[in-house]
Structures are given as C-alpha cells and as structure tokens.
C-alpha cells in the first residue's frame, strides 16, 4: 500500500506543468520504499506556474535538483499589465488636467465677473445671465447628444427645487459681495464654509462632529475675523453677502442628502447639476425683474457710456467660466473622495485669492495676509480631519 501511494504521488507530481524556477528538494525513503514520517514534498511557485520534482525512486535517500532558466511572464499577461499601467497614467493625467482647468476657469470667472460688476452692480441681473448661459449650454449638450437627457419625475423636481433656490440665492449673494468688496476678501470670508457645514449637518442630519473637527473651526473663524478687521475694502454689505452665500450653499449641500436620499442615483452628476442650473435660472427671472428690472437692454447700456461690445463679451466669458468650473467640480468629485475634493477646493481658493490680488493689484497688509493664511490653514486642517469623522448619514 505504501509503494502504491508513493507511486501515485510521483505520477501526479510528474504531470504538473514545468515553470521557470529552480527547486531543490530532499525526500528520505525507508527500506521498504515508504516515505519517512515528517519528510515533505516541496513545491515552489515562480512566474505564475507550479514546478514539481521528478520521480523519486530507488529505495534510498535521493536528492533531486531541477534547474530552469528564468522565463518572462506570458505575452498576454505582460501586455495586460502594461495596458493597465498606461490606463492608470492616462487617468491620473486626465484628472490633473481637469483640476488645472477647474482652477483656471475659477480664476477667469472671478476676474471677468468683477470687471462686469464694477460698472454694473446688479447681482440679480448678472446671476440670471450666468444661469441663462449655463442653461443654453446644457440644452445644446442634450440636443447634440453629447450627454443623454434625463428622465425626471415631478416628485424629483419638487425635491430638487429647494436646492435650486439655495443654489440661485447663493450665487446672487456671492455676486453681491463681489460687487462691494475685493475678490480676495470675498473668498477669504467664503473660507468659513466648514463652520456652516458643521452647524447645518448637526441641525438637519443629526451628525455630531468630533472634538478635532470642532477645533479646526477655531483658526477658520479667527482667521476670517482677523482678515476682516484689517481689510481695506471692508464693507458690511459685502461681508454679510458672502456669509449669506456660505449659509445658502451649505444648506443646499446638506439638504441634498436629506431630501434626495437615494433618489439622486436616478440622475448622474452631470444631469443633476444640469437640472439644478435650469431650475435656478427659472427661479432667478422673477427675482431679477422684481428687484432690478431689465438692466441688460441695449438702450440702458448705451446710456451708461460703457463699451457695449466689450461688456457683453466679458459677461459671456464670465457665464461660460461660471458654468464650466461648476460642472468640472461635479466631475472631479465623481472621480475622487470627498476629502480629496475638499483639499483641492481649499488649494483652489488660495490660487484664486493670490491671482486676484496680483491682477487687480489689491493692497493687502501683513496682518490681513496672516488672517487669510490662518483661515485657509484651518480649512485645510478641517478637510484632513473629515477623513476620521464618523459617517452618521
């Protein structure tokens, strides 16, 4: 029986596929041909293949060596690995290009928007124009079948409508702030968004922030306060408008979790943003007409003595950049984690502040710069600490 078992094992081992490896093994046999207790049949794996020992026989201790030259991976496996590596590099390069474009569009939006708002301080009209431009691009995208148009129910529209109202009003108050104070100061105030996120998440979603997250809000609030006290262009309307923008934008984000729940899965990120933009435009029209009337008529613009063609070109470019950077923000968020997106958004705010200071030659004191830096540092810390924040929603 022992000889039969040994012969059976040897036959099975000899039929195994030979791979590219070197295997050294020893097996001791007893005088009767049985395997001595404790002796092992070694097996190595190299290059993804099994390598077995040749048949051992003779009724005595045998030492076998099998030598084989190292062989490369099969051609199909090597090509697949190379393809995956090229694909990963291409995805990384594409993501990097999207982030750079996101930053550039944000910079140019703030520059063109400020250039339009300085001679025409009509935030409701400018907001309606920007949302109208975005809606036109969206319908063009659907008409050309660049992206499939969504199928949306009345119940979904009813749930998205409050979010659209928050989105529209947040944009109105941002434009109102930009028309009153420097671009750099508006974005310094808007760095306090995490404070409103924590407050609204606790109130509406029942999320309890950790002590570390609460601690990260201290430099944010302190930095914004320090920058506000030393801001040369300080204006109360500009300050409270930026604060109201923070409250409305973060209310939109928090309520989207509460109102939409799992139903947003029926809409992809692009179509959800598209519906949000179109509804925001429709809601902005009556507000614009009631608050400011029709300010973009050719007769009114000529009466101001402004260069009509130049003003319209800048307004159109601001609308294009506004829609472009917001859509890119959604697309980037779909590719990375929320924490990574928050950090990238923090860096984006730094880039916008620096670019606006350089372009508009905004005077800034050392204490003001310190306050801005402390606030942005707090935002970065908050973004990193969100990684450890428990998910209660």
Swiss-Prot record:
Major site of localization recorded for this protein: plastid
Listed GO CC annotations: chloroplast membrane; Golgi apparatus
Keywords: Chloroplast, Membrane, Plastid, Pyruvate, Sugar transport, Transit peptide, Transmembrane, Transmembrane helix, Transport
Topology of this chain in the membrane: Multi-pass membrane protein
Protein localization: Plastid, Chloroplast membrane
PANTHER family linked to this entry: SOLUTE CARRIER FAMILY 35
Function description: Phosphoenolpyruvate/phosphate translocator that transports phosphoenolpyruvate (PEP) and dihydroxyacetone phosphate.
Designated name of the protein: Phosphoenolpyruvate/phosphate translocator 3, chloroplastic
Gene for this chain: PPT3
